[in-house]
């Protein structure tokens, strides 16, 4: 499981993106991003999650987000990408 940090904004996205790329490759067939710690974020968090999804699917793995904050789900809907980022309880 990939654990998202408490803050994932434009300022931290580039650094975290590198870490996430490596983590996706090390995951088994199902890649799950745990967003339970995420409290401060902007649209960069969506970009990171979409990139993670793209990498997982390219590697033949499934992708989902666990415990996404309501505001993140709202932001995904606003940008029209809510259907691309499956959220589990």
Model-derived regions, located:
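STAS-like cytosolic regulatory interaction modules
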Residues: 1-41, 50-89
